Amino acid sequence: MKFVDEVSIRVKAGDGGNGCMSFRREKFIENGGPNGGDGGDGGSVYMVADENLNTLVDYRYTRHHEAQRGANGGSTDCTGKKGEDLFLRVPVGTTVIDASTQEVIGDLVTPGQKLMVAQGGWHGLGNTRFKSSTNRAPRQTTPGKPGDQRDLKMELKVLADVGLLGLPNAGKSTFIRSVSAAKPKVADYPFTTLVPNLGVVSVDRWKSFVIADIPGLIEGASDGAGLGIRFLKHLARTRVLLHLVDLAPLDGSSPADAAEVIINELTRFSPSLTDRERWLVLNKADMLMDDERDERVKEVVERLQWEGPVYVISAIAKQGTEQLTHDLMRYIEDRADRLANDPAYAEELADLDQRIEDEARAQLQALDDARTLRRTGVKSVHDIGDDDAWDDDFEDDEDGPEIIYVRD
């Protein structure tokens, strides 16, 4: 199934049913009182988190969703039937955003969680509601209120405990294959991974955690280059990040330079994401002699001024991976215990999570806006500065012929 993590849809709640104007008419009762019933309320639209879904592909081609309208009121004080609510099932981890205001309506992070995104219209009133001591035969009714209509943007962020960072061909997919039952595609060319992959890592049989692999980052990713920038948001909800570095790149490049590129791009994408717990994992150690391996490890650590945990592994040979997974499991459990017992720590992490979410959304929105400007041919702020510099080189052409470009 195709992986889709961003869609835009329009939802419309049902309108309320109209009130009825009716009077009681029976044998021997010629002038009975009013008995027009109220209309029914319109159906509302809800989002429901479904743990059996992992993509938003169902909403890629079906963009309009409308709940049922409430039935009109009837005679003999019959109230119209309420419109049926519409339940849209989405994967756990979906964020619902109002497209017009960019307001976050809610996050669906637990299975079965419901979120109302459009309120059904209020029912209209029948003429029975307007009778009084001075108005025995009212002919007044009210129509049902229209239901809410909203343009929504839905963003899916996979829920994983551990996220993998690294350049293409750093061995992220090989690592996730070696520690879990996931089987992502592995090849000797860049960008083998095109969509996020999830794997469940079992530790000591009864313990497990989820690990996420996203497409590799390249230099300039924070400006929209490559694939990884669109998927960095999936790491926003992870508990710990593993920064994978290839110790023996095929092109002979410096592992320290590659590690520095990832740090720079991560900082530009979301400064708060760099405050997340990160571990340095140096991969493909089996391809080097011991002296050369130790020298490259030292170079990377010194270049990054790294003070956190460092692991030297070989994912394909499964060297050092078991110790790494056990340490990850221990960290995740200790973190959960501290969250439960330390309110200050829990508040600090909640604030960090919110800052990461806000920065990631702002960065991706800026990239979307820039892409829209390019498609429409409108210059962005950065492009205007470049054109002004270009015009300065041709100030001597003021006396030349004037050329006017007209867009069809």
Swiss-Prot record:
UniProt record, GO biological process: ribosome biogenesis
Amino acids binding GTP: 166-173, 191-195, 213-216, 283-286, 314-316
Obg domain: residues covered: 1-159
Gene Ontology cellular-component annotations: cytoplasm
Stretches with biased composition (Polar residues): 129-143
Keywords carried by this UniProt record: Cytoplasm, GTP-binding, Hydrolase, Magnesium, Metal-binding, Nucleotide-binding
EC code(s) of this entry: 3.6.5.-
Cofactor: Mg(2+)
Localization annotation: Cytoplasm
Enzyme class, broadest EC rank: hydrolase
CDD domains: Obg
Record-listed Mg(2+) binding positions: S173, T193
Region (Disordered): 127-149, 378-408
Acidic residues compositional bias, start-end: 385-401
GO molecular function: GTP binding; GTPase activity; magnesium ion binding
Domain OBG-type G: 160-333
Oligomeric form and interacting partners: Monomer.
Similarity comment: Belongs to the TRAFAC class OBG-HflX-like GTPase superfamily. OBG GTPase family.
HAMAP family in UniProt: GTPase_Obg
UniProt function note: An essential GTPase which binds GTP, GDP and possibly (p)ppGpp with moderate affinity, with high nucleotide exchange rates and a fairly low GTP hydrolysis rate. Plays a role in control of the cell cycle, stress response, ribosome biogenesis and in those bacteria that undergo differentiation, in morphogenesis control.
Record protein name field: GTPase Obg
